[in-house]
From Swiss-Prot:
Its EC number is 3.4.14.11. This is Xaa-Pro dipeptidyl-peptidase. GO terms for molecular function: aminopeptidase activity; dipeptidyl-peptidase activity; serine-type peptidase activity. Homodimer. The gene is pepX. InterPro entries: AB_hydrolase_fold, Galactose-bd-like_sf, Pept_S15_Xpro, PepX_N_dom, PepX_N_dom_sf, Xaa-Pro-like_dom, Xaa-Pro_dipept_C, Xaa-Pro_dipeptidyl-ppase/CocE. Removes N-terminal dipeptides sequentially from polypeptides having unsubstituted N-termini provided that the penultimate residue is proline. Keywords: Aminopeptidase, Cytoplasm, Hydrolase, Protease, Serine protease. It is found in: Cytoplasm. Belongs to the peptidase S15 family. The active site is at S349, D469, H499. NCBIfam families: PRK05371.1-4.
Amino acid sequence: MRYNQFSYIPTSLERAAEELKELGFDLDLQKTAKANLESFLRKIFFHYPDSDYPLSHLIAKNDMDALSFFQSEQELSKEVFDLLALQVLGFIPGVDFTEADAFLDKLAFPIHFDETEIIKHIHHLLATRCKSGMTLIDDLVSQGMLTMDNDYHFFNGKSLATFDTSQLIREVVYVEAPLDTDQDGQFDLIKVNIIRPQSQKPLPTLMTPSPYHQGINEVANDKKLYRMEKELVVKKRRQITVEDRDFIPLETQPCKLPIGQNLESFSYINSYSLNDYFLARGFANIYVSGVGTAGSTGFMTSGDYAQIESFKAVIDWLNGRATAYTSHSKTHQVRADWANGLVCTTGKSYLGTMSTGLATTGVDGLAMIIAESAISSWYNYYRENGLVCSPGGYPGEDLDVLTELTYSRNLLAGDYLRHNDHYQELLNQQSQALDRQSGDYNQFWHDRNYLKNAHQIKCDVVYSHGLQDWNVKPRQVYEIFNALPSTINKHLFLHQGEHVYMHNWQSIDFRESMNALLCQKLLGLANDFSLPEMIWQDNTCPQNWQERKVFGTSTIKELDLGQELLLIDNHYGEDEFKAYGKDFRASKAALFKGKANQALIDILLEEDLPINGEIVLQLKVKSSENKGLLSAQILDYGKKKRLGDLPIALTQSSIDNGQNFSREPLKELPFREDSYRVISKGFMNLQNRNNLSSIETIPNNKWMTVRLPLQPTIYHLEKGDTLRVILYTTDFEHTVRDNSNYALTIDLSQSQLIVPIASN
């Protein structure tokens, strides 16, 4: 374990003493440091009628227990304080450590003893994470140190778990959206699942916009999947044009229906544990699946601003600008009289994507988004540089396949009976519009590109993204983060994992940082919290996070690739082609070992190479035919210890998100020896070699200059490392699988790897 503490708010002595007193700690500035520490320790053992007993189980020195120490005349020293602090945080002498000083250095322990600062040290200790993954104060509150009185209690600028999660209100309302996506002449109704604590005060809201939450149709999804085996189409030379079109919602009228009290209820919905954490701290949770999902009406428009509007309508309702009904019969309306109108959206992948889309509408009431692994351009999710390009791990998926997965109205047999025929017509229109044949950008994709509206974002923004996420690739967050207005507060966590949540990792206090931010933005707490704009997980060692100023630098280093002419054959033998088609992982293994159809260049680094941004391959290339697909991957190659990309559970249920509520495991990325690490990758239809909007012809056997931008990253390579460049055609995981008989030739003498270099 190593501390990377970004959530602690430095506090004055007076404020620290005041907050400790509010928690019931009997500390006094006139007492000695030793007396105050003893008083603190006895208080945290509140379960024991006799606190001598638990004190006797701690050691103050290697030869003295804590009870004996406090009964002695010995002075409090750094040695004693450190040893007791470690034990209070759950670290066991002789098990977790033998030498306290060395262990504290390894932990990067954030508290440095000064006898005159004991009150501040105790305050800081309470806000520091235990071995279990919870801060000490959260751990104590979870054990019942504070009663669940359904009111706010704050410590170090963060809300504590004092809302009773055993008496939650669970209710359903149906919000009227200014849409008619299924063309039935009726406004679409949007089902909203609300979970809120009982409270006399208006509550802020965490909203998870999740098209998955009302169920998914995996059978329809699997039937809709496309075969990837097809020839790469030769496209006509042309220029693509699109237009920016404002989404115009329908006009609704004020509702004059009576207020209803008898709301639909529910017992369970698959919740997001970060939401649960805030539910216990006085934040209502709502889950919304939007148009075309079970319990709602409308068509699943998948990624456009009509779908976004169905979520926006819910924020409007929370602020009194839209109508919600108690049921589909629409006999009574219901108002969000429990809400303070301020909303933060949460969630990963499609959920975070909807958060980004919502933010670009500039809707009033949306104070903040926490968007993890989020898409900012749907074209870049299902296409790349003029190619059909599947997200990592999902060959054959496309946006209409996702529509089938999430159109959960068809999971309700009655809805299927009444609406499926019309749904199939609308789905067919969507399938035609996305143009899987060419892979080109068009108006359909432009209408699902949130980047063009990034200037309209006015809420605070928090993004997290994995630099090993080949599902929602790093370009998605790179482009939206760098497009955000300079006038807003923005934050980015870049981790070394894949497509995963990071709120329950051991090495980073993400959850507590979000608590401080949300108390600022949604509760109006003046806590003086300041979070760095960008925090990056160091890839060279375990559990080390660093502040960064930018994602993407203009300083470059050009690396020569060699002097040879390299030939890349596209065609595989029939058996090999079929085998790779059945198991794309086998093709990846062969590729990384140099056993596939590829050109391979190894570069031994003579100095450190700190990459920050978008690596570009500038290549001199020719094709034997009038078509060509170019794929590339950059590897950190050779055996050494690296971070894994999938977090593993260190404990099973040590994190309590309330008071014995929604427990979850503590996780972390492992650090272990392996043979390589993918740094970046990229794909291109050579007919789109100049830009996305220009389709060019490919002259047979004529040299072309190609600039292939790879996925942006921040990655540190060290002197002596090997950087491996792999050039090839078909990627069996991502691209179409064209097995026609053509070849690419690369002139390495006129090719370079252009690397953006991080400044010191």
